[in-house]
Amino acid sequence: MQDYKLPAGLRDNFGPQATQKESVRHYLTGLFQRHHYTLIETSLLEYRDVFGPYELQAESLYRILEADGQDLVLRPDLTLPIARFLVTTNVSLPTSFAYVGEQFRRNRQLTGLYNQSTQAGIELVGFQSRRAELECLTVISELNRDLFNGRLLVELGQARLADLVLADLPANERQKEAIKAALFNKNVPDYEAAIAPFKRERHYPFLAEWTWLFGKADVVEKMVAPLWVNPAAREAMQEVLDLAKLVAQLGDQELLVDFSTAAPQAYYTGVTFKAYADQTSTYLVSGGRYDNLLANFQEKSEPAIGLGIDVTLIAQLLERSAPRDQAKPTLVFCQLADWPTFAKRYGGDPAYEACLADSLVAARTQAAATGQQLKVMNEEGDLIDA
């Protein structure tokens, strides 16, 4: 007999998991509508070239070969399809989009990670003002409050900071890449070895402290104040610190700044943000500014900022923390001729569930198996003990 298993890395959702995921999706759609974003659904299949700016190896993509030889992929990302949409339509800018959809990305085997996930997010295109960053962080704050009671940890960073700091360091590209790799991977021994040749440079005091430049904004601000960096790097850091002060006023949530973190993707150009839950080291929300994104598809670029929300992971965390002793609906058995009466009287009441068994004996068996109370509806529509 053939084994009809799912391909590795994919899964089915049912029962409480599927219910929780749909609940999160419904909440996010309502959140987006309250912020007056335009909902968008892009195609699940795209040409491979759409994801040229995306840092992903070919073996990580689900690929489909068209009859004409064109290379299609199941989308591994939902931001770049929106960029493709913008340059192939006449949508006027600025505009604010929101989406919920599936993405597919092959992970290494034996990592325990799934290759399919549901992502929601927003894309604010054509907005240069820092108000766009605050809009994204307000959405994160509302999600944090509504779904996690403020328990999410929000982290701010700067995508270009490493390149700005190292821009005028007298080092070759190989040395600069070694510094960045060790910094982003939090590999302190390799990092110290990478910066050792530059002890005589005025950059060195900052380089020596760089791996420690994370924490609460006021603490980090005091740490960087006496350290020399070039004006462009100083301005980039101050932008993040100023933004952190405004975000801190949004409500009760833990907020950190990390100047030693990598951008989520290579196309990011400014402030970045992530949100973590205490139950996982994987971020639930990530995003930031990417003002050069449309330049990959057309000559003219547009300022843009956005965030992605991992619906699948959020649903998993909420489902795990949900109380297990929730009351089950009462199972109601009735004769076939009395079904219209049941539907009118009890059909819209979540406290009751129609029993689809053919007989009262089968209904009792079903109730025993599911742990539900069983009632019988008589001809008058009253419920009596079974």
From Swiss-Prot:
Listed pathway(s): Amino-acid biosynthesis; L-histidine biosynthesis; L-histidine from 5-phospho-alpha-D-ribose 1-diphosphate: step 1/9
Question: Organism's domain of life?
Answer: Bacteria
Locations listed in the record = Cytoplasm
GO cellular component terms, semicolon-separated: cytoplasm
Write the record's keywords in alphabetical order, separated by commas.
Amino-acid biosynthesis, Cytoplasm, Histidine biosynthesis
- Which Gene Ontology molecular-function terms are recorded? catalytic activity, acting on a protein; transferase activity
Which GO BP terms, alphabetically? L-histidine biosynthetic process
- Cite the record's note on assembly: Heteromultimer composed of HisG and HisZ subunits.
To which protein family does this belong?
Belongs to the class-II aminoacyl-tRNA synthetase family. HisZ subfamily.
Q: Per its database record, what is this protein's job?
A: Required for the first step of histidine biosynthesis. May allow the feedback regulation of ATP phosphoribosyltransferase activity by histidine.
Record's miscellaneous remark? This function is generally fulfilled by the C-terminal part of HisG, which is missing in some bacteria such as this one.
Name listed for the protein in its UniProt record: ATP phosphoribosyltransferase regulatory subunit
Organism whose genome encodes this protein: Limosilactobacillus fermentum (strain NBRC 3956 / LMG 18251) (Lactobacillus fermentum)
